[in-house]
UniProtKB/Swiss-Prot annotation:
Reaction it catalyzes: 2 H2O2 = O2 + 2 H2O
Job of this protein: Decomposes hydrogen peroxide into water and oxygen; serves to protect cells from the toxic effects of hydrogen peroxide.
Coiled coil: none
Top-level enzyme category: oxidoreductase
Top-rank taxon, per record: Bacteria
Native source organism of the sequence: Escherichia coli (strain K12)
Keywords in alphabetical order: Cytoplasm, Heme, Hydrogen peroxide, Iron, Metal-binding, Oxidoreductase, Peroxidase
SUPFAM superfamilies registered for this protein in UniProt: Class I glutamine amidotransferase-like, Heme-dependent catalase-like
Gene: katE
Residues noted as binding heme in the record, renumbered to the chain: 415
Protein name: Catalase HPII
């Protein structure tokens, strides 16, 4: 049993101190107070150890989660056994000939344990290896039966389980979350008609037009083959060499170099289906559609210095934020949006709907929000659910169909092929996380890791010995068999691109012109940083030349940062034409249209010994009322005592929970001298200021203005007052809703943090 200090029952001591006690396998080692168990209710980020989803949210259920109950294995109150069920008496020592003699080969317990360990890892995904996932549900707002016969979109009362995986693209499974990269946004709908996978990204387009170039693009962006550098980054020669030679990449590169490439969290990130798909209604009428996910928490990003520092200070930042948000009850929510284009309008635009490097501007075709997805439960086991999840754009249900997008067509082959390689064979659909919730029966048989036991004596069709079961289902308006859309197709066999795919610069220009001034600065900074890592000068020059074909102002700014002088020819390049006459589309900017609120955000409160209790209580009350989480920080762990004797537990140190991980900083009034000379506290405020975060200083905490070199009274983004009254907190919360103090940008270059 745990040994408790007599004076402090909450102080735990190690139960093992010497070799005579090195047999813990039969003892209870948990604290008697039960503090090792998670609370089965929402808790603020970091307040308790994280827990498997079924322990933290046992009452959160849906049809898919219920089906997973059959394969979940808890170990509490069970004997330790081998994989064959044999109880183990000693799990501490190998079988030896004498206590100092050789280990015996007959030790089947050792052999099984080591062999299994040696084979625990499976091949990671070629791309999107680094990812995090969550369970949830989707519910449409109304029946969409006029445009699709898909059952899960036909009834506003129908709730469909989902499993969503977010990911980066370039880096390996152990790379950092906050690198500059495109993010994957893959959703598995467990519908009553089968599985539908919407396998998208956080950009509405991709780098290439034809799947034939996918291996080349991925080879170029991945670590360079001769030395496997860099990890989780595109800032290297081979990627930019490819970009400079393939202008079709430029549109998605613009998105990656923008703030979209460094999202604040998965909760504040849009998702897109990338390709044009078809919706088919019961009458067989088709409508082109592009899919969108709109985050209800609003859109937000990191800033580049912050993203870089997080790769070292908290490389799991996005994974942690997603997990802790769900545990806190701040469920990520997204609205599913459709851009609908009637078939007769296929050639209405000056770009091709089948081109995956082109988007459909929302100014031309508004997004119709048709339903909501809520992520409300974490996985129980990262490997079993996240790593073994197999998404596939070819997983569709009646009411949906493909188009002739050449990138999509190649993906339909690639995903099956890679799952067979990664998950060991063709039966990856039988892994619990991948199983549909509806029945499935066919004549596919055998193969590696087959789970089901087929009792049908006929493994072919047609057959008479099992009365021809399972049988085909005719197409129908409801619960019918899948029927491909009857599109007329004709043409000669050729290897060529459609001329309608041939314009590469108008869409990147539209994206550039749609950004706010500070977002444009960030794009320039993104290109400048990445290209500064490119060793070969001619590659840098070629990329700048490509940028000159998009926008001269952009090219000049990047060229200046790289020490490149534009030629007269480059200075006189004619700008590309507008996209369907459109010069700007505010939906392409993260910040042109304010959205979202402060619920689920995190504020750091830098405490001092003898902090004014009344101020702190007012601060905590105001934050709680808006669903904002507070972290009490100090120079050391333990407790501090307020001016009225209240004892306050410390959540983390100034260094342990850096300003990178919070959205705003408050320093309440009190004994400020206690932390005034603390380097970590001063750096905390300086760094938060540099990263454009709101800062609130109450009473004598205003002395910290000198730290960040603020002399002016009333600078935007700095809230100051004699005490933390209602107006003090209202001003701070208003600033937080804007996410950053963008007006501060001209000042931050002087901040050394």
């Amino acid at each position: 049993m745990s040994q408790h200090n007599e004076k402090n029952p909450h102080q735990h001591q190690s139960p093992l101190h010497d070799s005579s006690e090195a047999k813990p396998g039969m003892d209870s080692l948990a604290p008697e107070d039960g503090s090792h168990r998670p609370a089965a209710e929402p808790t603020p980020p970091g307040a308790q150890p994280t827990a498997p989803g079924s322990l933290k949210a046992p009452d959160t259920r849906n049809e898919k989660l219920n089906s997973l109950e059959d394969v979940r294995k808890g170990s509490e109150n069970y004997a330790l056994t081998t994989n064959q069920g044999v109880r183990i008496a000693d799990d501490q020592n190998s079988l030896r000939a004498g206590s100092r003699g050789p280990t015996l080969l007959e030790d089947f317990i050792l052999r099984e344990k080591i062999t299994h360990f040696d084979h625990e890892r499976i091949p990671e995904r070629i791309v999107h290896a680094r990812g995090s996932a969550a369970h949830g549900y989707f519910q449409p707002y109304k029946s969409l039966s006029d445009i699709t016969k898909a059952d899960f979109l036909s009834d506003p009362n129908k709730i469909t389980p989902v499993f969503v995986r977010f990911s980066t693209v370039q880096g390996g499974a152990g790379s950092a979350d906050t690198v500059r990269d495109i993010r994957g946004f893959a959703t598995k709908f467990y519908t009553e008609e089968g599985i539908f996978d919407l396998v998208g990204n956080n950009t509405p387009i991709f780098f290439i037009q034809d799947a034939h170039k996918f291996p080349d693009f991925v080879h170029a962006v991945k670590p360079e083959p001769h030395w496997a550098i860099p990890q989780g980054q595109s800032a290297h020669d081979t990627f930019w060499d490819y970009v400079s030679l393939q202008p079709e990449t430029l549109h998605n590169v613009m998105w990656a170099m923008s703030d979209r490439g460094i999202p604040r969290s998965y909760r504040t990130m849009e998702g897109f289906g990338i390709h044009t798909f078809r919706l088919i209604n019961a009458e067989g009428k088709a409508t082109f559609v592009r899919f969108h996910w709109k985050p209800l928490a609003g859109k937000a990003s990191l800033v580049w210095d912050e993203a870089q520092k997080l790769t070292g200070r908290d490389p799991d930042f996005h994974r942690r934020e997603l997990w802790e948000a769900i545990e806190a009850g701040d469920f990520p929510e997204y609205e599913l949006g459709f851009q609908l284009i009637p078939e007769e309008d296929e050639f209405k635009f000056d770009f091709d709907l089948l081109d995956p490097t082109k988007l459909i501007p929302e100014e031309l075709v508004p997004v119709q929000r048709v339903g909501k997805m809520v992520l409300n439960r974490n996985p129980d086991n990262f490997f079993a659910e996240n790593e073994q999840a197999a998404f596939h754009p070819g997983h569709i249900v009646p009411g949906l169909d493909f188009t002739n997008d050449p990138l999509l067509q190649g993906r339909l082959f690639s995903y099956t092929d890679t799952q067979i390689s990664r998950l060991g064979g063709p039966n990856f659909h039988e892994i619990p996380i991948n199983r549909p919730t509806c029945p499935y029966h066919n004549f596919q048989r055998d193969g590696m890791h087959r789970m089901g036991i087929d009792t049908n004596p006929a493994n072919y069709e047609p057959n008479s010995i099992n009365d021809n079961w399972p049988r085909e289902t005719p197409p129908g308006p409801k619960r019918g068999g899948f029927e491909s859309y009857q599109e007329r197709v004709e043409g000669n066999k050729v290897r060529e691109r459609s001329p309608s795919f041939g314009e590469y610069y108008s869409h990147p220009r539209l994206f550039w012109l749609s950004q706010t001034p500070f977002e444009q600065r960030h794009i320039v900074d993104g290109f400048s940083f990445e290209l500064s890592k490119v060793v070969r000068p001619y590659i840098r020059e070629r990329v700048v030349d490509q940028l000159a074909h998009i926008d001269l102002t952009l090219a000049q700014a990047v060229a200046k940062n790289l020490g490149i002088e534009l030629t007269d020819d480059q200075l006189n390049i004619t700008p590309p034409p507008d996209v369907n006459g459109l010069k700007k589309d505010p939906s392409l900017s993260l910040y042109a249209i304010p959205d979202g609120d402060v619920k689920g955000r995190v504020v750091a409160i830098l405490l001092n010994d003898e902090v004014r209790s009344a101020d702190l209580l007012a601060i905590l009350k105001a934050l709680k009322a808006k669903g904002v989480h507070a972290k009490l920080l100090y120079s050391r762990m333990g407790e501090v005592t307020a001016d009225d004797g209240t004892v306050l537990p410390i959540a983390a140190t100034f260094a342990g929970a850096p300003s990178l991980t919070v959205d705003a900083v408050i320093v309440p009034c009190g004994n400020i001298a206690d932390i005034a000379d603390n380097g970590d506290a001063n750096y905390y405020l300086m760094e938060a200021y540099k990263h454009l975060k709101p800062i609130a200083l109450a009473g004598d905490a205003r002395k910290f203005k000198a730290t960040i070199k603020i002399a002016d009274q009333g600078e935007e983004g700095i809230v100051e007052a004699d005490s933390a009254d209602g107006s003090f907190m209202d001003e701070l919360l208003t600033l937080m809703a804007a996410h950053r103090v963008w007006s501060r940008i001209p000042k931050i270059d002087k901040i050394p943090a």
